[in-house]
């Protein structure tokens, strides 16, 4: 049924959907570089982490520890063993390091190598990723979520006018490295420029610039144009050069020939005027002396005679100063040009408030500000300053950061330079000043642009953890080097792996980004692996994140899904990767586009990041195109720079790959998504992830074509690794004999797939696989051979297709409630299996050992009937709450016995009172069947009968695998050898010495009958007369066979050894037992159900089939929904799905009616072709036999599957045509009759098939009741919540309600005996037992708590009770 879906999509698929968990697997592969030879490994990932810390030298430089290579060993337990035993799936990591010891020549100060010691060291275990992109940590499956954070680089921003009341913009810049100190540049209200290092106190930026070695003069010359003024006698002249541009003319400019005025005094000079002035051969222009006061000097002015400084640079000239200049006969002045409106004064003014004279002073000032407690010395201050931004060890801008900086500041620096340079900081300050002055080329950055946000995937996150651990280890190594004698030391004496292992295991166990995998169904697994989070270490926090960060941004198109995100406080902070998106090596998200050249769309595809996409003009995927690839139409709606524009075809240079590249996997599964309101689509995508896998899954009649892809990539189904023929198949395994082309010498050519049976998932849903191939069937590589949970025939099947009517029915669909037919419960359509795990441990306590046993004191035989001899519940037993699962006794503390008791005890050996019953019992609300029990025993402890039985069962399974594998390869070789030997003459006699039987005489003709009698171990002795080549071939085949059998035997023995070995248990635990109970949950009132369009509701009533509204032909509908749930919610997609679903169901029935009424042969085929209308399908029908066609049609009895891809789905006319084909009313409505009265309803009612899901919010998990139970110690009130077996809180509002009704006695009872009146509780219990009807409420305990609290505040409060 799922093999062919009628597809309504009009756009052909250009690019296959990439593997959906690629983001996880690729990232971890690049991190490990496991398959790369050590010498060829690139400097990132694990290799990069080691290289960044090694070599480690001691403080005196006498020795150095160098890193050579690492290798990853073999895994000890496979994935399933780790899950069962609660282990971490990890492999040993070994590193090769060498210790180099130097001798220093005292005279020449030269270092000579004295000694080199190289050694391989065990470096802890490194967790490995499973094929499904998850990690197994302590037996639970976890996912490392990728983090979306701000990319390193430089960012310019302003405060949007919020700081100052005047609304003036205050600009700032920030340089963010991957590792190291942040550098902030910011203006204040007076336009002074300040710098902050690591968000500490701000200081004038010039302190930092001076610390880098720039003098005041250098700074003025760098940031300003300098004018040269000559002084001759009483007059001053300005040099004619570039610095005059933008200034007013100091004097009239006349033509040298005619003397007429070309430019009047006061005219503003631009480049054209400057050129004309130079043409007049004017070299200087006379200035008015009044122009000079207030001009700022660009250099110091020295006395020509004494050399003393008359005026410092950055000083303003005064009228008196001009007189001094004339007096001293100074010939030339340099002044700075502050711009026409004197706006560019930031650096000049900042220099005025900065008191630093020399770079040394500036460095010490910075050290003082960042390290206030340490007294500075010039040396330490200099070292500290260099380490802030200029050294690789402490500062790393990363290649991404350097590239972004080059792009923004228009620099041309190699991306290998990952530290800051002085020039970078100067360029940043210059850009910030230009930005403030409104230079057109400068712009602020949008931090929500995906060019400024990058993804840290698993590999990078774990690499960072290794770095942190290695840096801690480095300190310890340096100390050890200085303390111990280097001559005798070996590398392993220095390296202690504990700090590294601790950091890595802490990350996997408790980091915010390492999450317990959402395993409700295959879709929730895939979505969890594709999730991007802005939270986590180094990211945002929920409280601080504003609206902008959460909002959808134009650059999200095709990269991040605009629909799928959680509702609530995390909205927009946790998002999902779009279907075709991928993360590139720098961590930026790319999306694919088809290239357009000269107006023609090419099949070539290119992936672009958000920055690369900025200047492209991109047409949508559904833009009509002619056969030659040129666009239809004169104007095309396209995207350019985040906006929608209409352009001519020649301007377009890219086209979207597919209409669904915009949304994520979960949203792609919603048919008619384009007709749903985005809020409802969001709920729809989120609720599909909560759908419980059903006992009998069914694929959706109306799908989108993505169902098969999701099922395949999720890892829930079993995919054939190689092509071959199914040799045998049963409920728990599939054996495939591979085709010869795929075999290698050591390979047996047999693939055995063990299916997962009834395993508990992280969310207590049932993970079960069942084979969908038959014995003798041929399978191709990549075919799906077994279905998993929530999959049907290799497609995702989260729910069921049910017949729905949109109408009101007796108020049972008020507020989105759902009315359901009893047929659905009867036929187990929405029945699901849930598996709960209960465990208990027998520990070694101070008072003695606990024991797991059937012999429990004071428990009757009735309660023990389900336990076996070992005290563990039997398989297949039905249990309910309170039943014993595992019998366990714990020693009690010794009580002081009287001498009589001691005597009695000595005589009768009475020991039972020394132990108490601590058995594992079924908790309240659980009722089901025991499906499995696992027993783990400590080393040295004896295995009980149950453990032995479990072990024998597992070994028998392995034995069966071994026998099958050996049988298949032996038969294959026997067949090949038989064909070679048949009809040949035997060259020697074949005798079985044990049985003394002659099988072949020399010279006999070899026949298949004779060969079949000869035992396998004698085949190698068969020789052929006069045919050496055949003999050699046979010998080679037999040798290969024995090799392969040896491999199989070795594998089997290794597995058996593992099974027999004792288990690693936590300290102090002797034995651990896990019991698994399967609970069958039928649909019942209170369960939550939903469609795929955000149409959710709670089941209000299960109605007998005969009362449901029914069609004219007597068929009742399955579900009744409220029609008012559609218009206000604007999810019209569900109505279109209803119509199309009805048509699909109707066509399936029509075809089967044709089959039943013997309309076979061509008529049936033509009908099929008319429905599917696809070339591929026609080929299939024409090639199929009559019987195959009938079988195919029979499968369609439930309806024909159709796919309506997102944004390219079925149109209204398509749906009408389908309804007509199925002979159904084209309105999609029908007259229904009331099941209670048989009367028709007034109007026609919209009916059809909807795919409905049962969600994980089941009423059985939520309903809870308590009479007596645990109480809080302080307040003596009942605890709260189902988990604590708590009571219902009676809050203020409830008290008011009781008061309003005057229910005084009930209220008094609520607040005293039913809550915290301890004495009253006991009294009322006694009264109930005796059958009396008295109630004496006393003083609530909370009153005493209040009194004590007041007394603790030194208020003397006491209650005086009257007698």
Curated annotation (Swiss-Prot):
Pfam families on file: RNA_pol_Rpb2_1, RNA_pol_Rpb2_2, RNA_pol_Rpb2_3, RNA_pol_Rpb2_45, RNA_pol_Rpb2_6, RNA_pol_Rpb2_7
GO terms assigned for molecular function: DNA binding; DNA-directed RNA polymerase activity; ribonucleoside binding
EC number from the UniProt entry: 2.7.7.6
Cystine pairs: none
InterPro entries documented for this protein: DNA-dir_RNA_pol_bsu_ext_1_sf, DNA-dir_RNA_pol_bsu_external_1, DNA-dir_RNA_pol_su2, DNA-dir_RNAP_su2_dom, DNA-dir_RNAP_su2_hyb_sf, RNA_pol_bsu_bac, RNA_pol_bsu_CS, RNA_pol_bsu_protrusion
Reactions performed catalytically: RNA(n) + a ribonucleoside 5'-triphosphate = RNA(n+1) + diphosphate
GO biological process, one term: DNA-templated transcription
Keyword hit for Transcription: yes
SUPFAM superfamilies reported for this sequence: beta and beta-prime subunits of DNA dependent RNA-polymerase
Any one GO CC term of the record: DNA-directed RNA polymerase complex
Keyword DNA damage: no
The protein's role, per its UniProt record: DNA-dependent RNA polymerase catalyzes the transcription of DNA into RNA using the four ribonucleoside triphosphates as substrates.
NCBIfam families given in the database record: PRK00405.1, rpoB
Subunit structure, as described in the record: The RNAP catalytic core consists of 2 alpha, 1 beta, 1 beta' and 1 omega subunit. When a sigma factor is associated with the core the holoenzyme is formed, which can initiate transcription.
Family: Belongs to the RNA polymerase beta chain family.
Protein name as it appears in the record: DNA-directed RNA polymerase subunit beta
Organism the protein comes from: Syntrophus aciditrophicus (strain SB)
Gene transcribed to yield this protein: rpoB
């Amino acid at each position: 049924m799922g093999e062919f879906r009628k597809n309504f999509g009009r756009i052909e698929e250009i690019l296959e959907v990439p593997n959906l968990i690629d983001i996880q697997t690729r990232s971890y592969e690049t991190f490990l570089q496991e398959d790369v030879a050590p010498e060829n490994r690139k400097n990132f990932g694990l290799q990069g982490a080691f290289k960044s810390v090694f070599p480690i030298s001691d403080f005196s430089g006498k020795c150095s520890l160098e890193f050579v290579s690492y290798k990853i060993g073999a895994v000890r337990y496979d994935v399933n063993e780790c899950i069962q035993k609660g282990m971490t799936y990890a492999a040993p990591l070994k590193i090769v390091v060498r210790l180099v010891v130097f001798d220093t020549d005292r005279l020449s100060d030269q270092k000579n190598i004295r000694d080199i010691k190289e050694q391989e060291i065990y470096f802890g275990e490194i967790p490995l990723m499973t094929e499904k992109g998850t990690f197994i940590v302590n037996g639970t499956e976890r996912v490392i979520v990728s983090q979306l954070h701000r990319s390193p680089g430089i960012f310019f921003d302003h405060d949007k006018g919020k700081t100052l009341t005047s609304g003036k913009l205050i600009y700032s810049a920030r340089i963010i490295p991957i590792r190291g100190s942040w550098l902030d540049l910011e203006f204040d209200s007076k336009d002074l420029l300040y710098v902050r290092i690591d968000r500490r106190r701000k200081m004038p930026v010039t302190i930092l610039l001076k610390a880098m070695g720039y003098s005041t003069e250098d700074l003025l010359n760098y940031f300003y144009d300098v004018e040269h003024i000559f002084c001759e006698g009483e007059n001053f002249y300005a040099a004619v050069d570039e610095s005059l541009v933008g200034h007013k003319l100091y004097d009239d400019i006349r033509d040298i020939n005619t003397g007429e005025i070309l430019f009047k005094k006061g005219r503003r000079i631009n480049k054209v005027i400057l050129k004309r002035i130079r043409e007049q051969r004017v070299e200087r222009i006379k200035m008015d002396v009044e122009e000079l006061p207030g001009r700022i000097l660009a250099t110091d002015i020295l006395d020509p005679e004494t050399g003393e400084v008359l005026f410092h640079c950055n000083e303003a000239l005064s009228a008196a100063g001009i007189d001094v200049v004339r007096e001293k006969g100074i010939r030339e002045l340099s002044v700075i040009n502050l711009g026409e409106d004197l706006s560019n004064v930031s650096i000049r003014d900042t220099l005025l408030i900065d008191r630093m004279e020399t770079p040394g002073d500036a460095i010490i000032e910075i050290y003082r500000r960042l390290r206030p407690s340490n007294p500075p010395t010039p040396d330490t201050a200099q070292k500290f300053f260099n380490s802030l931004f200029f050294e690789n060890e402490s500062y790393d801008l990363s290649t991404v950061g350097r590239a972004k900086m080059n792009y923004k500041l228009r620099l041309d620096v190699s991306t290998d330079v990952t530290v800051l340079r002085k020039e970078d900081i100067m360029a940043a300050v210059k850009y910030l000043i230009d930005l403030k002055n409104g230079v057109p080329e400068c712009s602020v950055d949008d931090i929500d642009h995906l060019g400024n946000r990058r993804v840290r995937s698993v590999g990078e996150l774990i690499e960072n953890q290794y770095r942190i651990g290695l840096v801690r280890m480095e300190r310890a190594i340096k100390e050890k080097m200085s303390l111990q004698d280097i001559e005798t030391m070996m590398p392993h004496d220095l390296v202690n792996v504990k700090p590294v292992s601790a950091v890595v295991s802490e990350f996997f166990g408790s980091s915010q980004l390492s999450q317990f995998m959402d395993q409700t169904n295959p879709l929730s697994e895939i979505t969890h692996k594709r999730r991007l989070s802005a939270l986590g270490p180094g990211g945002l926090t929920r409280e601080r994140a504003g609206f902008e960060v959460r909002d959808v941004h134009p650059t999200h198109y095709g990269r991040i899904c605009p629909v799928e995100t959680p509702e609530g406080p995390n909205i927009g902070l946790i998002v999902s990767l779009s279907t075709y998106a991928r993360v590139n090596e720098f961590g930026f998200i790319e999306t694919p586009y088809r290239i357009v050249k000269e107006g023609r769309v090419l099949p070539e595809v290119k992936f672009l990041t958000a920055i690369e996409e900025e200047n492209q003009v991109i047409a949508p995927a559904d833009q009509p195109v002619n056969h030659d690839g040129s666009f239809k139409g004169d104007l095309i709606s396209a995207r350019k720079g985040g906006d929608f524009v209409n352009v001519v075809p020649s301007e377009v240079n890219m086209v979207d790959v597919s209409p669904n590249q915009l949304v994520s996997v979960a949203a792609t599964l919603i048919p008619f998504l384009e007709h749903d309101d985005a809020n409802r689509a969001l709920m729809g995508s989120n609720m599909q992830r909560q759908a419980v896998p059903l006992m009998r899954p069914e694929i959706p009649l109306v799908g989108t074509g993505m169902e098969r892809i999701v099922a395949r990539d999720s890892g829930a189904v079993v995919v054939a690794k190689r092509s071959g023929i199914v040799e045998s198949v049963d409920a728990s395994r599939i054996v495939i004999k591979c085709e010869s082309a795929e075999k290698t010498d050591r390979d047996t050519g047999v693939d055995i797939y063990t299916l997962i049976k009834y395993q508990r998932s992280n969310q207590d849903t049932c993970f079960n696989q069942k084979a969908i191939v038959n014995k003798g069937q041929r399978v191709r590589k990549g075919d799906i051979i077994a279905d998993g949970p929530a999959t049907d025939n290799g497609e995702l099947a989260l729910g069921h297709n049910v017949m729905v009517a949109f109408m009101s029915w007796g108020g049972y669909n008020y507020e989105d409630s759902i009315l359901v037919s009893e047929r659905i419960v009867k036929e187990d359509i929405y029945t699901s299996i849930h598996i709960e795990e209960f465990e208990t441990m027998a520990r070694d306590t101070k008072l003695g050992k606990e024991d797991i046993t059937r012999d429990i004191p004071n428990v009757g035989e009735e309660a023990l009937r389900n336990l076996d001899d070992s005290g563990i519940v039997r398989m297949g037993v039905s249990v309910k709450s309170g039943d014993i699962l595992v019998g366990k006794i714990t020693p009690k503390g010794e009580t002081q016995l009287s001498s009589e008791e001691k005597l009695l005890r000595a005589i009768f050996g009475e020991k039972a009172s020394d132990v108490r019953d601590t058995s594992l019992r079924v908790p309240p609300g659980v009722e089901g069947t025991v499906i499995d029990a696992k027993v783990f025993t400590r080393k040295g402890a004896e295995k009980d009968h149950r453990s032995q039985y479990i072990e024998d069962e597992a070994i028998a399974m392995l034995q069966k695998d071994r026998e099958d594998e050996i049988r298949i390869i032996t038969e294959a070789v026997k067949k090949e050898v038989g064909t070679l030997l048949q009809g040949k003459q035997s060259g020697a006699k074949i005798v079985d010495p044990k049985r003394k039987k002659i099988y072949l005489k020399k010279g006999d003709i070899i026949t298949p009958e004779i060969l079949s009698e000869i035992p396998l171990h004698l085949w190698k002795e068969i020789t052929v007369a006069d045919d050496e080549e055949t003999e050699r071939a046979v010998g080679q085949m037999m040798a290969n066979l024995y090799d392969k059998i040896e491999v199989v035997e070795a594998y089997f023995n290794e597995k058996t050894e593992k099974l027999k070995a004792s288990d690693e248990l936590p300290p102090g635990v002797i034995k651990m037992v896990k019991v698994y109970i399967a609970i069958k949950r039928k649909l019942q009132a209170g369960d939550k159900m939903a469609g795929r369009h955000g149409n959710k509701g709670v089941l209000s009533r299960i109605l007998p089939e005969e009362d449901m509204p029914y069609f004219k032909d007597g068929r009742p509908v399955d579900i009744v929904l409220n029609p008012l749930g559609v218009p206000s919610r604007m999810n019209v997609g569900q109505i279109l799905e209803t119509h199309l679903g009805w048509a699909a169901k109707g066509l399936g029935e029509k075809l089967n009616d044709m089959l039943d009424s013997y309309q076979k042969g061509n008529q049936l085929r033509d009908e099929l072709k008319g429905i599917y209308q696809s070339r591929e399908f026609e080929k299939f029908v024409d090639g199929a036999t009559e019987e195959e066609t009938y079988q195919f049609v029979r499968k369609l009895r439930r309806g024909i599957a159709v796919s309506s891809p997102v944004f390219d789905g079925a149109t209204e006319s398509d749906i009408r045509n389908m309804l007509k084909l199925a002979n159904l009313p084209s309105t999609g409505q029908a007259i229904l009759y009331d099941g209670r009265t048989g009367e028709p309803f007034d109007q026609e009612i919209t009916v059809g098939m909807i795919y409905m899901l049962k969600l994980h919010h089941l009423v059985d998990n939520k309903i809870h009741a308590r009479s007596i139970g645990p109480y809080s110690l302080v307040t003596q009130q009942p605890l709260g919540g189902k988990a604590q077996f708590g009571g219902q809180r009676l809050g203020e509002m409830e008290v008011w309600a009781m008061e309003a009704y005057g229910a005084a006695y009930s209220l008094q009872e609520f607040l005293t005996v039913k809550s915290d009146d301890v004495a009253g509780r006991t009294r009322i219990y006694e009264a109930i037992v005796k059958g009396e009807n008295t109630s004496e409420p006393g003083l609530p305990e909370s009153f005493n708590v209040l009194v004590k609290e007041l007394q603790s505040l030194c208020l003397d409060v006491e209650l005086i009770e009257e007698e």
